Regions:
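Hydrophobic alpha-helical transmembrane segments
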Residues: 11-27, 147-165
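Hydrophobic alpha-helical membrane-insertion segments
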Residues: 107-123
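Long, contiguous internal "core" modules enriched in hydrophobic/ aromatic residues
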Residues: 1-105, 119
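Short, membrane-exposed interhelical loops at transmembrane-helix boundaries
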Residues: 131-153
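Membrane-helix interface motif
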Residues: 1-2, 122-134
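Transmembrane alpha-helical segments in integral membrane proteins
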Residues: 26-39, 161-178
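Membrane-interface capping segments at transmembrane-helix boundaries
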Residues: 96-103, 167-183
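Short, highly charged, low-complexity non-transmembrane loops/tails of multi-pass membrane proteins
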Residues: 112, 178-194
């Protein structure tokens, strides 16, 4: 009420809230394991694939449950498209992982992440943080946005800095483009006190 939180701990720790935290966490573990499998060899790669398989199965179950529950609970009709794209990305990624196609597994899990984000935020729109007591207290895109001056400054910062970040990320990826293995890691030298 009046901008104050009126619930308790169990208002926040409900099954849907826990699923909204756990499903994306498992999806990012899955995505990270796919990337690690893509960039490694030998034992590191096998452990990453093993983690990817387990996290992928957990993600398909938890993520599928979250997407359908969220869609039924509050999603508009157009977000069913993103639900299908996210589910398809998860399934394709899991199948590509099983076929040892690390690049496709990584790309498909990235598509699933993008579709999940669009689905979850699309189901909230125009709210950014909906109120559970009265819709009048919800934070919307309009009342949570910055002033026009701030948005203008941030737009110019983004116009200048986004290409810099993209070039740096491209260069970083190019420098670390080869797969690594445990054998390519140099031994650690501990300095002795003299």
């Amino acid at each position: 009420e009046a901008g104050d939180f009126t619930g308790n701990l169990f208002t926040l720790l409900n099954p849907f809230g826990l699923l909204r935290g756990g499903a994306p966490a498992s999806l990012f573990i899955f995505h990270g394991a796919n990337f690690l499998a893509l960039k490694s060899l030998g034992g590191i790669r096998e452990r990453a694939r093993s983690t990817s398989t387990v996290a992928g199965i957990v993600t398909v179950v938890a993520g599928g449950t979250l997407l359908v529950w969220n869609q039924i609970e509050r999603g508009p009709a157009w977000t069913w498209i993103t639900v299908v794209v996210a589910a398809g990305g998860l399934v394709v990624s899991l199948l590509a992982d099983r076929a040892h196609r690390d690049g496709w597994a990584f790309i498909a899990s990235g598509v699933a992440i993008a579709a999940l984000v669009v689905s979850l935020f699309g189901s909230l729109y125009p709210d950014v943080m909906p109120s559970t007591t009265d819709a009048a207290y919800s934070l919307t895109v309009d009342n949570a946005s910055s002033t026009n001056y701030t948005l203008r400054v941030m737009s110019w910062v983004a116009v200048i800095m986004t290409p810099v970040v993209l070039v740096y990320q491209g260069w970083s990826y190019w420098v670390f483009r080869k797969r690594i293995s445990a054998e390519s890691i140099p031994p650690v030298h501990v300095p002795t006190r003299g």
